[in-house]
């Protein structure tokens, strides 16, 4: 499935601005104590602008008006960050809604009629909105499935590309784990009877849309904890600044010419000291993290799941579909007995030229790579249209052999059968070539080299699959097949290990195959001959050690483990039980996607931590700017702290508030995009965080505040 696209147009930009003002409602802002206090400060500034002498102030109306406007902009910019992020979330929900298709359904009048005997007299064509839950509909070739349901009779090839993005159709049939169908998908062949399982407005897509919208609104546990921390800091600063007011009154009683501290300037100091930057961006960071997950076509049921992905200690991976493609491809040819390389390559090529299986196509591809391209009767390379699996095959060596494809079209291709466990070709000259499982070919052949078993066992021990090849009853060699590793999977596993996540492979394959795959990609730990039911025990064992664990699954038997795991990524192509149990659903049904999800979770936590560090460092810098400016008149010794040598106290206050307000919109793109994240250890990330965002947070205010003060001097403002 193509990535869910999100586009914010001009109208939505205007909507975000409008929402920024709507969020000024105190009943809404009280949920964010930091911004609520800033809004109260704005109100105090407005009162002092209207009545400057109310608190015994000595500043001008213009000065107080400037302070009030800057405080107001601080709140508005913070609201805009949240509103813009929320619009991105809404745009994602709209993208999912665009996948919904209005369709008509053939509502059966009699559910008992045999599917092969259904005619137009047996059903009524009605709108999908009129079909009730538990009703049975008939879906013929070329029809759109009107509603989500379960196949109760028949089997059909279904195009689910609108939902999954997979162009390859899937088989849906009654019985087993492949009975679930989704409304809006198309039946390409055959016919099925479907029992509707959802009410109107409760389809799979409706649920996904609801999950996206709900997840955007819900605060995550870490965000709640951060809000509590910021609230505590805000309370401390409110008490400290309020105490300073009375301290100023005390100083005024014996310091000549000092009339006390200006309330508006104290409000400015309070706002500058509070963690307004991270308080303003917290919601935007959360929503943006959810947005990045959804853009990967993963639906997270809550922000908790995304955060948990960033905190994972262990990741359980399936072999097939996650680490390997699930396809076996030819890796080498091994001659036996009196045969040589050329004999084995030629026989393997001829027996596989019309074999449409992945293994057959990869054998042709490997033979051609070892000997150069071969021209068929039609003048086209026999492997020209091979699929991706064959493309990854590398020739182990060069073999001089004539691969004559001419005349093979007149030969008789023998397809694979479960009974013989072999396939092959009968050439027009009477030659019989067979390839297949070693024991099957061994039983078929009349001449078997003594090293057949030894060589086949060696291939099996290396994680491969041996196919024996025989010509006229004589075994001439072995074709070595290997599970095809997903491109770049070793690098991705190494990357996730750098994040401090332990990788564990659980597979039903034998020990030899499991060990070979684990060694190839660098898995930390593997479990072979593993039943899906055992996964929940593995999850519980890891959690008993105090670790967070993630896994993927698609079957009903995966559901308990998916529900138990801290991060359970269910495949959209899987069963309803799996999708309900997991806290994430991958619309692309790509198990290796969980590695990306872990990276997104890490980036979310990294972004929040980095901007928190930057915000706190900002506050420290602003403290050294404002405190000497406000108290220098009463305590001249504080002038030594004025390291920027700002022109006037009014200029210092105004420049600081300008920086405090405008740094928020400047950081919105970073909050939405996320900080650049590379897989590193926790110690390396902490060091980088402190240097880049801690150091940057200390230096940036000094640079910008001094620049603004110099601009004021040049313009003659506050002089």
Curated annotation (Swiss-Prot):
InterPro entries named among the record's database cross-references: ATPase_P-typ_cyto_dom_N, ATPase_P-typ_P_site, ATPase_P-typ_TM_dom_sf, ATPase_P-typ_transduc_dom_A_sf, HAD-like_sf, HAD_sf, P-type_ATPase_bsu_IA, P_typ_ATPase
Chain sites annotated for binding ATP: 355, 359, 416-423, 435
Annotated Mg(2+) binding sites: 554, 558
Region (Disordered), start-end ranges: 372-396
Active site: 318
Catalytic reaction(s) noted: K(+)(out) + ATP + H2O = K(+)(in) + ADP + phosphate + H(+)
GO molecular function terms attached to this record: ATP binding; ATP hydrolysis activity; magnesium ion binding; P-type potassium transmembrane transporter activity
Disulphide bonds in the chain: none
Keywords, sorted A to Z: ATP-binding, Cell membrane, Ion transport, Magnesium, Membrane, Metal-binding, Nucleotide-binding, Phosphoprotein, Plasmid, Potassium, Potassium transport, Translocase, Transmembrane, Transmembrane helix, Transport
Matches recorded under HAMAP family: KdpB
Family: Belongs to the cation transport ATPase (P-type) (TC 3.A.3) family. Type IA subfamily.
Protein name: Potassium-transporting ATPase ATP-binding subunit
Species whose genome carries this gene: Halobacterium salinarum (strain ATCC 700922 / JCM 11081 / NRC-1) (Halobacterium halobium)
